[in-house]
């Protein structure tokens, strides 16, 4: 079987919005004192999210009031293998998942910033790779097929939000923060994994730098399982929150 290429990796990074509808997963971070809790989440596209600690403490239920995508919204240009060659750009189309705490959450679920660069996140050019991608290797991640690559950001890298990019980059930090909030030493590269079935970024890991090993590790537990409305209901004030679930 032919190993995936850097172009395959980029195409998978573009594809998440069109590869799944519901997701249950856990995620934990390394090397970040602000994100030191392991979480479990249930996400139902386009606008429902439930987040708990892995011990069952309910942290937040998000119920956005998002209008369904207009039937006239353009569809992506696909490759013969079904991965996305070019994402549509239209005000009629919104593919962002509900956010928990920061846009890092949105970016790991839809890691388009790892595919194409440009002048802004919404104006991307497939001819401007966001990353320099070393050999792509098929691996197992949490019992699921994934593609792993060691990558480096290019001058075209444009994260969804500069304050919480998937990959820390000196240029992006300077644009976002000026002389503040800089790393003492930036990573030489990053290890990144994309889940093949969903396109979700399931791993980032800094290689070298002042905080080696920093990143996130997401483990997918279920894809496209039914998720009832009752799962996305906050308990009434005063109810015991730990482990509370209307579907138990």
Question: Which ranges hold each PLM region?
Answer:
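Non-transmembrane domains of secretory- and envelope-associated proteins
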Residues: 129-132, 141-144, 155, 169-190, ...
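Generic short beta-strand segments
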Residues: 26-31, 150-159, 207
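Short, surface-exposed beta-strand-loop junctions and turns on beta-sheet-rich folds
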Residues: 57-60, 67, 155-156, 209-211
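Short, hydrophobic/aromatic-rich segments at coil-to-beta transitions
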Residues: 19-26, 47-50, 142-150, 200-203
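N-terminal leader/targeting segments and the immediate start of mature chains
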Residues: 1-47, 74-108, 126-140, 176-180, ...
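Exposed beta-strand-loop-beta-strand "reactive/processing" segments of non-cytosolic proteins
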Residues: 37-42, 147-150, 155
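Short, surface-exposed charged micro-motifs
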Residues: 39-41, 50, 60, 189-193
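Short hydrophobic/aromatic-rich beta-strand segments that constitute the beta-sheet cores
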Residues: 49-53, 68-73, 201-206
